[in-house]
Amino acid sequence: MGSQCLILLLSLTLAQAAEKDRPKFTPGPISSFPAQQTNGKVTVAARVFVKEADLRAAFGKLNPNDHGILPVLVMVANLSGQTLALGDLRVEVITPDRRRLEATPAADLRYLSGPPRPNMTPGPIPGRTPRLSRRKDPLAAWEIEGRAFSARMLPAQESASGFFYFQARYRGGSRLYLTGLREAATGQELFYFELPLEDQ
């Protein structure tokens, strides 16, 4: 029993150390977002991430745009007296030519490029088995899922933020369309939110 406790304690310590090594990312106050809309006492704000400095602050060396993924940071501020249910949240980008693009779940991004092909490099000694190269998909980086929007409930007077990911390039004149916010107690859906996505 004592060895199991020691192993558990060691794994928790290592997890905390790994978390400390990860760079911090703060979305900033909702007032700093370039696009905002308030319905009742709920405000939704959005910021598209295409600038190198913004991407580096959020994703480190990984630039999702290089892999055809557009990250959009969304913040929801609930200043109402009701808890909001976010489980049915639906987020889309509407392009200037009116195409609707649904957000891709963060957990699915690592599979977009398909399984990596083994690199059958011949071994250094003839007759030996070739070495397999184990190339990791760049979109499997912890920042993708770790910084995704994950809130399912939002208590009164609180806010939640995170990224939604779209398989698209940024196009000026695009808009973010968000539906599915409900009052948890009544199930009543809030009015939709539609925000411009301008690169600012």
Residues covered by each model-derived region:
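Conserved functional micro-motifs across diverse proteins
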Residues: 16-200
